[in-house]
A protein has these predicted regions:
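N-terminal glycine-/serine-/threonine-rich phosphate-binding loop
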Residues: 1-32, 245
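Glycine-rich N-terminal segment of FAD-binding domains in flavoprotein oxidoreductases
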Residues: 26-51
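Glycine-rich beta-strand-to-loop/alpha-helix junction loops that act as flexible
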Residues: 34-39, 130-134, 197
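A glycine- and small-aliphatic-rich helix-loop capping segment at beta-alpha/alpha-beta transitions
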Residues: 46-56, 81, 143-153
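Ligand-binding beta-strand-loop-alpha-helix segment within the catalytic cores
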Residues: 56-129
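A short secondary-structure junction signal
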Residues: 110-112, 139-145, 149-151, 204-208, ...
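Class I SAM-dependent methyltransferase SAM-binding "motif I" and its flanking Rossmann-like core
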Residues: 135, 139-183
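ATP/nucleoside-binding phosphotransfer catalytic cores, i.e., glycine-rich phosphate-binding loops
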Residues: 181-184, 188-245
Length: 245
């Protein structure tokens, strides 16, 4: 596992964008795994600036990590809406090549299998962008998630619901279920890029990078990935003991 420590959040965005840019230039039709939430927003903004400056990402495909169950794609609180706003439109991607797990439907279990099939038909994910929750979750794979899990409907931990309540009018409006790519799905990406900023992520980064590989910290599974890179700022790296922040 490679560790890159930047001075601050802006440096994290630049370092992460360099990784994506190098991939896109080497493989213009790359398939990206797209994290949602606040962690990757700096990366997406930096990529948007590079696209405005001439970086061509029009042939890139994308698969989002997760979605809330019960929110329609045009709901401004949905991750489908977030992906359109922060990725598809500013990076000038083809909307037909950007996929988000369905949060509504008659049979979400079948839809999850179809999502896995779509990733396979695209040739797999070249680079999976990831954030990390304060409880160590990846995507919406909460603690106790099986390390070999696939895309599925899952329950949201109360900790995660509290963290995400800031995006909703009231805490009770946060959905209790989600659709998420599984840890096994994430591990099949050819490269994994984990982004973290701020002191609130220091404990989870320390566990993910230096703790035991365990379902109690889902992100720790990345220790087993053959090509994983963690890009974090000094605050998020503050509790690492094997590298200098």
């Amino acid at each position: 596992m490679e560790i890159i420590i930047a001075p601050d959040a802006a440096g994290v965005a630049i370092a992460a964008a360099d990784i994506v840019t190098d991939l896109v230039r080497a493989k213009p039709n790359a398939v990206l795994g797209l994290a949602t939430g606040s962690s990757p927003l700096g990366l997406y903004a930096e990529l948007a600036a590079r696209v405005a400056g001439g970086l061509d990402m029009t042939a890139v495909s994308g698969f989002a990590l997760d979605e809330y169950v019960g929110l329609l794609p045009d709901d401004p609180r949905s991750y489908a809406h977030a992906i359109r706003s922060h990725v598809t439109e500013p990076l000038r991607l083809d909307p037909g090549k950007v996929h988000v797990p369905p949060g509504v439907g008659d049979d979400l279990d079948v839809a999850c299998h179809l999502y896995e099939d779509a990733i396979a038909r695209a040739g797999g994910i070249d680079l999976q962008v990831l954030g990390i929750g304060r409880n160590g979750h990846l995507g919406f794979n909460e603690p106790s998630s099986p390390l070999a899990s696939r895309t599925r409907v899952a329950a949201l931990a109360e900790w995660t619901r509290r963290d995400n309540a800031r995006f909703f009018d009231q805490p009770d409006a946060v959905p209790v279920q989600c659709v998420t790519q599984g840890l096994g799905t994430i591990m099949e990406a050819r490269r994994a890029l984990l982004i973290a900023t701020g002191a609130a992520k220091a404990d989870s980064i320390a566990l993910a990078v230096e703790g035991p590989v365990s379902p109690s910290c889902p992100a720790s599974v990345l220790q087993l990935h053959q090509n994983a890179v963690v890009v974090c700022d000094r605050e998020a790296a503050a509790k690492l003991t094997r590298v200098s922040a």
